[in-house]
């Protein structure tokens, strides 16, 4: 979507849009296996991967837009992520998607996986991977925030502003409150 946004920005600024940007943006291919699961790359055949690249096509990019395809992709790739060297952000992406699909149990499981193995003493900062001692990993921390704000609370940034989409909370959570959003400092609440 970066090319799409670049084209939109150029138009807003009354700048010419290079034809190649639009051409490439319209012709990006999403590869799939015969069963419809999105393929990591052209020669991918099920081996271990570092992170959830394919699943970023479902959230936050929305190239894979329907929930059924997103779920199939998540179920396929969740056990393909390297458990020792995969970054925390993969599971936060899964958390957002499951929370928005209404699967509170699976969303919470992914939420825990997105930070618990990566916590480092003495301050509880997040390392990049479960085996890394290199804190502070800001992408992982950002993913953790997205899991709560965009996943459990359901907030989505759109061209029209911030919207609250349907989502669910874990069974033992009562509510999530996100305050001070946008220039109007709005408050959003998701209750069980």
What is each PLM-predicted segment?
Residues 4, 8, 12-141:
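Active-site core of glycosidic bond-cleaving carbohydrate-active enzymes
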